[in-house]
């Protein structure tokens, strides 16, 4: 028997409950994994609220990523062995004691590393790494502005950006200014400063790259912060949430603003707009521009490369071993406290990763 978290209907943290049921059996090409650590992220809050693109209908189990140990192989599995430690980007389903997942979607994890620490690499640091290197294709010396710089993805971007030799700028609250500056970025107080005016005062009148994980009207202003040749990467839609629940007004505003900035990208001969979703690269599909002037290609087109996620994960492991990145684990909570983890997430009561330990 095993336990898992279930969302019976969309809503706030109060909709989460624990159920007990028989262990799952892996199907063809699947492995069953005993979960050692499962992450809690804002994407989980969006899944729970019903505002995530492609969210399944309830009931379902949240949980975007996991670290675990292979317990059983389904028919046709050849790469992994029982006892192997693996990480996986599940999108949903990780908040359980045991999970069946495709063998092809699991990446090997060294056994000597802390599972909760490595969990940061599966989603948070992977997102940051691919935003910089797979999507924006940054070069040393370029200026990069990241919104929400004190958040989980934001701090990962700043760490990886420093390794890449970038000039970094980050929007944050006054309370988080010192934390952002410690990571080597110029902090911009989004409540009291106009970030567009700040970066357009720089030599070159703007930044080379803006990373926008909020979306909505912010994306329109972010486009204006680009210098000629600049790239805007939109990778989230947290503006569609209000108090932890789906906001229809937020959705309407997000789609209107995103459509507007996409049109600007299509019409601009000198600036590009990209949309990034980590599943696109996990599932071997290159992210291409929404618009970059004449001949722009649609998102999701382009060549397939089945090794990108695995290659990038290995690069992150090397940086972790070299002590060049420092993932933070905010709290480790038992699976039974999933509701509390979501409450902490929405209160912004923690800096670092919230981890469930089944």
Where are these regions (language model features)?
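A structural motif shared across PLP-dependent enzymes of the aminotransferase-like
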Residues: 90-103
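Mid-domain Rossmann-like dinucleotide-binding core that forms the NAD(H)/NADP(H) cofactor-binding site
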Residues: 126-193
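C-terminal capping/lid region of NAD(P)-dependent oxidoreductase domains
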Residues: 298, 317-332, 339-358
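Glycine-rich phosphate-binding loop and adjacent beta-alpha segment
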Residues: 217-322
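A glycine-/small-residue-rich N-terminal strand-loop-strand element
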Residues: 67-91
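N-terminal glycine-rich beta->alpha transition that marks the start or flank
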Residues: 11-15, 21-67
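Short amphipathic alpha-helix with an adjacent loop that forms part of the alpha/beta core around
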Residues: 194-204
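Short helix-loop-beta connector
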Residues: 81, 111-114, 137-143
